[in-house]
Amino acid sequence: MFDERLARIARGHSRDMATRRFFSHTNPDGEDATARGKRAEFTCRKPISTSSYREGLGENLYQDNLYSRIHFSGTERSYDWNSSDKLAANSLRAWMNSPGHRHNILDKVYSQTGIGIAISNDDKVFITQMFC
């Protein structure tokens, strides 16, 4: 189920990556997904059996460009822009072809998700998907 709080945390991480020019589950301040969630007063605790639980957020990251190709003709340049549908399809394909990312998407313990997208000044697209 979509969760707006997770989406806000995900957007914040995507914006942070776009602004500070990094691509990682851990930001330059040393915060991982769970720490960023706690800073936003969001904790995730899921039972995995009658006597144990799992605490923490899951996270998938994806980076792409706004364009798929640049054409140069003399001093002119033009772009083949990626549509939002194309960017969504690219991210999902990449995640589903990666065992760890695929596991996050299909893990039945997670019941909430949020996605955040940011675009950097140099046309990079950062997508963060978070799970609880």
Predicted regions and their residues:
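Acidic helix-start/capping segments at beta-turn-to-alpha-helix junctions
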Residues: 1-18, 28-36
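A generic structural-conservation signal
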Residues: 1-2, 26, 46, 114
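Generic secondary-structure boundary/loop-capping signal
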Residues: 14, 20, 58-59, 102, ...
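Conserved "HGTGT" condensation-loop signature of ketosynthase/thiolase-family condensing enzymes
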Residues: 22-24
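A well-ordered secondary-structure block
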Residues: 33-122
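Short, low-complexity, Pro/Ser/Thr/Gly-rich segments in the mature regions of secreted, periplasmic
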Residues: 122-132
